[in-house]
Amino acid sequence: MQTDCDVLIAGNGLAALTLALSLPESFRIVILCKNRLDDTASRHAQGGIAAAWSGEDDIEKHVADTLEAGAGLCNEAAVRTILSQGKPAIEWLLAQGVAFDRSHDGLHLTREGGHTCRRIAHVADYTGEAVMQSLIVQIRRRPNIRVYERQMALDIQTESGAACGLTVLDRRTQETYNIRASHTVLAGGGLGQIYAATTTPPECTGDAIAMAIRAGCAVENLEFIQFHPTGLARSSENGRTFLISEAVRGEGGILTNQAGERFMPHYDRRAELAPRDIVARAIAAEIAKQTQDFVSLDISHQPAAFVRRHFPSIHRHCLSQCGLDITRQAIPVRPVQHYTCGGIQTDPCGRTSLPQLYALGETACTGLHGANRLASNSLLECVVTARLCAQAIADGQAFQAEPFQRPSESLSAEAGIFSDDLQNTFSRPVLQTFNQRHLGILRNDTGLRRAIAQLQLWKQNQAEPHTASEYENRNLLECSLAVAQAAYRRRQNIGAHFNSDC
């Protein structure tokens, strides 16, 4: 097959750039950026990268914390494979020029919810930005890597039962074209923009996951949508809610309700350091009992210099955008969609059920996160799986996936139950608000069945897309329906999925 490149990567986040830099320099590599090279969800990551680094920690402890957070649904073999590469991943990032914070005896490690010890390597509270800046410098030094900006991947091209490239939309001209490749990699992030309130940037419209579904790839665990407990309860900017890092609670931040009472000890023995799903549901429960739509996160009992040193971007944002000085005042917070725990089914090397197609980062479901992601495991997964993927591609290793049976689109026969309530008019804000209500932290059978019926109707009535926005809407609908169906099929309350009728 004549190809335009050896490896075609749709996405420009941490996993995508790590893969490109880890492949042999003899490979012809193309990176498709939906917007600019430096515009990606990875850049907004605050917390850090979890790895068993210190003398008081070890891989077994990290594995145990990950399995507990994942609520029994992690793939333990994948967990061990990925976490065992934590220290080499940090060392690789150091070699790329990432200047992690230091203490007197080495890396400065912080602690976050669900972790039993300090193991989070970080750069203040803007780790993602620092990491991405370093990798972009390295990318621009590689003549074998071509970067195409403002290019949107639309669909997977196949030949003889294997992926052979992508159909792409040039967002500058709205023209489509094909790129053929020996290896195709989807690394376009999650589906956060199906919700009205999300920490993800506007580009996270589930493009890669939707493409994979249309191509018949195996996907799994899409019901497990992680809601971060502490999004800033102020107006969002550019469709993205500002995140208040897990590390604020890790460094002693206290959650209080409208009455000024600390409430987390009533919900979990780990209090503010419980896993994200537990803290998010607890905050939602407290908000339901009070008149204000937020709770307070207070770190002001720590020395002001400590707060400014550890959380400079949070301090700066709250002061400039909200007039809040977090060294003296509590931060108003509420849960916000943050991460897609499921995705395209892969092994730890990123290999999917479709030959020559790979998926990495939040797009993929390796089994590491199970029903709920442990804080700061996602950036680690990006680096480790991308490096393993590079090795698999270079070595020509094949992955024999289990046969995949696409779930039937059940409940379509019941759509008539809600016929009086369904809306024919579709818009992105309407979809996002609808999903926030029915596919949010707290779900129920009636809401999920109504969601499936409504989403199927919108999907059936959708016109053929021609513009970038229309293609994004197609993907948002595809992903929304997949989440709703997965949530309805899950008859157990576990991790990030909670159905009051189960």
From Swiss-Prot:
Listed under catalytic activity are: L-aspartate + O2 = iminosuccinate + H2O2
Top-rank EC class of the record's enzyme: oxidoreductase
Q: Which residues bind FAD?
A: 12-15, 34, 41-48, 207, 362, 378-379
Residues the record marks as site: Important in orienting the L-aspartate substrate: 112
Active site, per annotation = 276 (proton donor/acceptor)
**Which is a Gene Ontology cellular component entry for this protein?**
cytoplasm
Q: In which pathway does it act?
A: Cofactor biosynthesis; NAD(+) biosynthesis; iminoaspartate from L-aspartate (oxidase route): step 1/1
Q: Which UniProt keywords apply?
A: Cytoplasm, FAD, Flavoprotein, Nucleotide-binding, Oxidoreductase, Pyridine nucleotide biosynthesis
Spell out the coiled coil positions from the record. Answer: none
Subcellular compartments: Cytoplasm
Q: Name one GO molecular function term.
A: nucleotide binding
The cofactor binding remark recorded in the entry reads: Binds 1 FAD per subunit.
Biological processes annotated in GO: 'de novo' NAD biosynthetic process from L-aspartate
> Is the keyword Hydrolase assigned to this protein?
no
Question: What InterPro entries does the database record attribute to this sequence?
Answer: FAD-dep_OxRdtase_2_FAD-bd, FAD/NAD-bd_sf, Fum_R/Succ_DH_flav-like_C_sf, NadB, Succ_DH/fumarate_Rdtase_cat_sf
EC number in record: 1.4.3.16
Mind telling me which Pfam families this protein's record contains?
Answer: FAD_binding_2
Please give the cofactor(s) recorded in the UniProt entry for this protein: FAD
Say if the entry is tagged with keyword Cytoplasm.
Answer: yes
Q: Member of which family?
A: Belongs to the FAD-dependent oxidoreductase 2 family. NadB subfamily.
What does this chain do?
Catalyzes the oxidation of L-aspartate to iminoaspartate, the first step in the de novo biosynthesis of NAD(+).
* Cross-referenced NCBIfam families: nadB (TIGR00551)
What protein name is recorded for this chain?
L-aspartate oxidase
Q: Which organism is it from?
A: Neisseria meningitidis serogroup A / serotype 4A (strain DSM 15465 / Z2491)
